[in-house]
Amino acid sequence: LKMNHEISWGRGDIASKIYGFYENKIQQKLKDINNPILIDIGAADGFFAIGSLKSKICEFCYAFEETKKSRENLSKTAKINNVQNKLSIIGKVTKDNFFTLLPSKINFSEVTILCDIEGGEFDFFSDEILATIRYSNIIIEIHKNHNKNLEIDLLERVKKYFDVSIIIDNDKNFESVSELHALNDIDRNLICSEGRSYIGKWWHLSPK
């Protein structure tokens, strides 16, 4: 993946992305699932959308991103990596317009959905949405919320249709990155830092 110099989201985690540490368990999960279609909800600057196309993890990606600057960066980065013809960049998505923004004949059994919408997941994944995408693999970043019932309620909804496994991304393996071996612990960990205020948590939903 060739990265665009113009970054609108997460400038502090560039080193982590360059060395392959950034959300590396999610990278591996996408590779393991290996569905031909990726729907990236909250695509930001396109690390996963374009990275998955460039590495041939998927064949086509629908990237939803509400921020205009990020959509512009997505387009530029897609051209830099020569995958612009395999990418559809779409604006803000809600539970009400989601299906209208996708091809009507999309086969959701061939789809992986990756969702990172800063807490909006608790509202977006309604029972109607989940029932329609029940044959997809879904990876949702679960954000902290003061109302614990939101996470409990979402878990109850998804368990109707999916088996749920929890991914905690809190370990980075430096073994294969020899240029980091001589650094002290602080500098080495700063390089792989994603700047989080708490350990990241995702749910992987696999069809029952």
Outline where the language-model segments fall.
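S-adenosyl-L-methionine
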Residues: 1-64, 72-77, 83-86, 101-108, ...
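Active-site segment flanking the S-adenosylmethionine/decSAM binding pocket
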Residues: 37, 41-45, 88-152
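Active-site phosphate/pyrophosphate- and oxyanion-stabilizing loops and adjacent acidic/basic residues
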Residues: 28, 152, 156
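Conserved Class I S-adenosyl-L-methionine
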Residues: 155-168
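Glycine-rich, phosphate-binding/catalytic loops in enzymes
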Residues: 55-56, 80, 129-133, 156-157
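Conserved SAM/SAH-binding beta-strand->alpha-helix loop
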Residues: 67
